[in-house]
Amino acid sequence: MQTPVSPPQESLADIRREIDRIDDGILELIAKRLDVVERVRAYKAGTGSLGTSPIRPGREAQILRRLIDQAGDRVPADLCFRIWRALIATASLKQAAIRIHGSAGFFASPASQALLREYFGPTALAEHPSEAAALKTVAAHPGDLAAVALDGPWATAWLEGHAGEAQVIGVLPFIGAASPRPELLIFGHAEPEQTGTDETLVLTDGQLPRDFALQPLWQAKTGSLQLSSLPGFLSEGAAPLVGLTRSNGSLALSVLGRYPSPIEVRS
Ligand SMILES: C=C(O[C@@H]1C=C(C(=O)O)C=C[C@H]1O)C(=O)O
């Protein structure tokens, strides 16, 4: 027996007109957002802070965390992430031309390209023969970024100083189910900003002592060196890192960067 169906109260055309009105509203709001970004660009140009990079990873992370939290069950976290990353990437490109430098070997990975595309949208990718060449280029162009695979051959180039003042400003993926460690590191000159949920990436020659105050969030080997992501926005000159450096000089600890922790969502 068929279940009786009640005739729809409204026509499909009426419902679709409502979708069209909502889309018009979204479009107007996007245009308004881009106009406000132009004022941010002018402000940064006026204070000289565009000279380094228009990208503010801390602010970007706070926007995403707030909206994903506010969306709750009404809008999937992944949709929020994709929409606002597309908006933020375009907003950044409106402020300055940005390129992402990487080695040919790194860009040959479709998975790496996909992670970069979903985070940086249409930002241009510039291919180099090696990680060292990509890091050297970002050192010379502070508004640009460099991307490397966590398990790629970048650490020696970094230790040899090829990245200049560039630091790790973020890791990808930025959203997802808890994973043991990220896949990509992003280098740049954006000023690190504390967001309340941050990590500090350190490179050491050997394991951190077992009794060290902080439990690493993840660790990875890179060549003979040890990479550890520590919870918090830490400074080399303050506790607990300063004590670690003093009592364990042979670790040759260097801070690679400080950045907002990725967003963990249940799969
Ligand atoms: C608009 C800004 O510039 C960039 C774009 C952002 C955005 O689209 O919201 C946020 C931070 C910056 O990476 C800003 O600094 O506020």
Where are these regions (language model features)?
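Domain-level signature for soluble enzymes in the chorismate/prephenate branch of the shikimate pathway
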Residues: M1-S267
